[in-house]
Amino acid sequence: MNLQENSSQQLKRTMKSRHLFMISLGGVIGTGLFLSTGYTLHQAGPGGTILAYVIGGLMMYLVMQCLGELSVAMPVTGSFQKYATTFIGPSTGFMVGIMYWINWVVTVGSEFTASGILMQRWFPDSSVWMWSAIFAALLFICNAFSVKLFAETEFWFSSVKIVTIILFIILGGAAMFGLISLNGTADAPMLSNFTDHGGLFPNGFLAVFIAMISVSFAFSGTELIGVTAGESANPQKDIPRSIRNVAWRTVIFFIGAVFILSGLISWKDAGVIESPFVAVFAEIGIPYAADIMNFVILTALLSVANSGLYASTRMMWSLANENMISSRFKKVTSKGIPLNALMISMAVSCLSLVSSIVAPGTVYVVMVAIAGFAGVVVWMSIALSQLLFRKRFLKKGGDVKDLTFRTPLYPLMPIAALLLCSASCIGLAFDPNQRIALFCGVPCIILCYLIYHFKRNVTKAKKISQEEYPADHIL
């Protein structure tokens, strides 16, 4: 492919509203919902689990409202990395971009490994490595061929997950209240699992607090819609609509599914169930429930990997476009694909995959810890960028009425987002299982700042040019 670097050869604006919506949902709905919810339910109880998801959803909603104002005013690829560069400082923009890139390349490698393991259910004698390589090659082709192919692939991947969740909520709710009979059960559970076995908070509020920390990270991925802003065909119209839809639908899907799970499965049994979704579908009497959910979870894994590969590639392109890393990574093909950035992102994802086998207790643990911590750091940067953007916008004589998308209740909403995200970070220190994210993430942030300041005399980061977005008078 012919790679070009001239200013006129930028990324292509070909994504439609439905693509933006599904890509954002695809990044957030993964195995955490389908597999890990049982563990959270066992840990925090039914009331604690729902409360944890409500607070996590609230945090996500606050951040998305901040991102909406920024993305509509400045619809550029790289999104929050460029916003952090312009409104917080170039060193913070560099840190945010690197942390977000690490987050996704590690995640993509993990998804490939998990996908290979799932395939062994149907092909027990096959190799995990073989399936991982096949899926990696397929997703690389989807991302390398054209933005439209990637977007369409992600649209259908995400559709499978969303249909499954909707069916689960409808059928599970019907079974919970006696409209559908459960196998081997005379009476519908109704709300008994919320009142029996210790009630809503059987393990106390400390368990709820710890669950809140882990669940708050489960919503990371919705910010992907900001990364797509620079390739949206009509950002002024599509981004506001997509952000509003993603925010409330994600909350409904997550909390609705968790409510049904909590009503149908006792919190005492939830910790030993491999997949609570399989258990519920099997109890309802859905034939081949395990195989169906194996396919859905496989689709979820590939969807997250697909979105993650896209996000890491665009973030690397954005860093190169800001003169923060080698200019080789901002070269694009004639179809607007940053192929060099795609290849290096895929290569590092594969190294992450290898480290999960070769050094699972050392290198891989550290990488996963940093990746998990990166999500909340990015959210904090979005909230702070919006706070500073609005302040500068008003100082330069801007009128809030001129903003197509306005963050409500400014400055309370971005401040609340910052406080909740900060609480999540601090809370990591109180959970022995998640403390490593804090211990590895903070040094990585410091290292990013040191690297940037070491290199700043060699390359200078550029602010978003006035041609790239309509709010040019705030600079």
UniProtKB/Swiss-Prot annotation:
Subcellular location: Cell membrane
Gene Ontology CC, one term: plasma membrane
Keyword terms, alphabetized: Amino-acid transport, Cell membrane, Membrane, Transmembrane, Transmembrane helix, Transport
Biological process (GO), any one: amino acid transmembrane transport
GO MF term set: amino acid transmembrane transporter activity
Topology term for the membrane: Multi-pass membrane protein
UniProt xrefs under Pfam families: AA_permease
InterPro entries per the UniProt record, alphabetical: AA-permease/SLC12A_dom (IPR004841), Amino_acid_permease_CS (IPR004840)
Transmembrane segments: 20-40, 44-64, 87-107, 127-147, 162-182, 199-219, 246-266, 277-297, 341-361, 363-383, 410-430, 434-454
The family this protein is said to belong to: Belongs to the amino acid-polyamine-organocation (APC) superfamily.
Descriptive protein name: Putative histidine permease
Annotated organism of origin: Bacillus subtilis (strain 168)
Lineage: Bacteria, Bacillati, Bacillota, Bacilli, Bacillales
